[in-house]
Every structure is written in C-alpha cells, then in structure tokens.
Amino acid sequence: MIPKDPMILFSFINTRLRDSQLSLEELCSELDIDRVDLEEKLRAVGFEYDIALNRFC
C-alpha cells in the first residue's frame, strides 16, 4: 500500500527510487501501481519526474 498524502507519497517514491536503483517503470511494476496515475498525483502538487535524475523534483 502506498501513502495517500501527496507529500508523503513524494518522499516514499523518491526514497524507493534511490534505495532500489530501479527505474520509475520498474518500481511501479514492483508496487503494482499505475505510473500515469502516480505521475498525475505528484504533478498536481508540483512535482515532475526527472528521468535523468530518476526522481521527482
């Protein structure tokens, strides 16, 4: 289960991306979540995924 609060979700996803060294696509698959939905939730609070950095910022 992933956090519902967008700020906690932001921190959770970035931590998992950093610690696991997975791509966003791989992490979403591992967590069984929709990548587009995740990106929309975080975009709504001002965060965009940076593929070069492999994190939301």
Briefly describe each language-model feature range.
Residues 51:
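Short, acidic, Ser/Thr-enriched surface-loop or helix-capping motifs
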Residues 27-28:
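Short alpha-helical "recognition helix" segments of helix-turn-helix
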Residues 34-48:
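Short acidic, Pro/Gly- and aromatic-enriched capping/linker segments at domain boundaries
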Residues 1-23:
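N-terminal acidic leader/helix
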